[in-house]
Amino acid sequence: MRIFENYHKVYLYIEPLVDGEPDEQKRYHISNLLCFLEKYLNITTNQYIRVKQNYKTLFKLKDNKKELHHKMNIMFGDIHFMLISMEKAYSLSIRMLEILGRPDTANMIRSSESYKIVKFFRNNLEHMNDKLTVEDYKYRESWYSNEYHSHWFARQWESMHGNAIKLGPYSFEIDESSFEFLWDLYDQIFKIITDEYIIPNKVNVDLAFKGHTPSQW
C-alpha cells in the first residue's frame, strides 16, 4: 500500500508568490485539493491495513462468538469508512482534473467501472436508513429472499466471500489491486502539477524562500 506525502514538499511551488496574480484563485484551489486528496488517500490506506489485520484474527475466534461479533463490527466499520474515503478521493481527483483543464480525463473516471463500484457502495451506505426499511426486489438473492421479504441491503452488508464484499450488482475486492486505478490517477495529477507549476516556478520560489523551502520534492 502507498502513502502520499508530497503536498508539504511542493505547496510553495503551486501557490502564487504574490497577491493579485491572474491565476491566484486557481492555484490556491489546486493546492487545497492536493492537500485533501493526499489526506483521503492515506486514510484509505490506513483503513485497508486495519481491515486486513482484523480479518486475519477472525478465524481464531470461531469458538468465541461474542469476540468474533465485536471484531467483525470493527472490521466492517473500517470497510465502511475506507469506501467513503475512496469515493472522496475519486471526487477530489475529478475536481482537480477539471480545474487543471483535463475534462476528458475527469469524464473517463466518472464512467469507469472502478468509480461506479465505489460510488454505489458509498451511496447505499449513506442512505442505509432507506435501504433497511424499504422492501426492494431489485437485487434479491435466492439464499435470503422470498416473495414476502427482500431486505437485500441488510442481508448483504457485513458479509464477505474470501476478500470480496457484495452489494447489489457490484462486488469489491479488498485487495491492493482495487486501489491501483486511484493511485494511477494521483500519479497523473501530480505529473501535471509538476510540469505546469512546480518546475516552472521552482527557481523563483527557491530564491524567494531561500533557506525556508522544502528540502526536496
PLM region spans:
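Histidine-centered, metal-coordinating catalytic motifs and their short helical/loop contexts
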Residues: 112-137
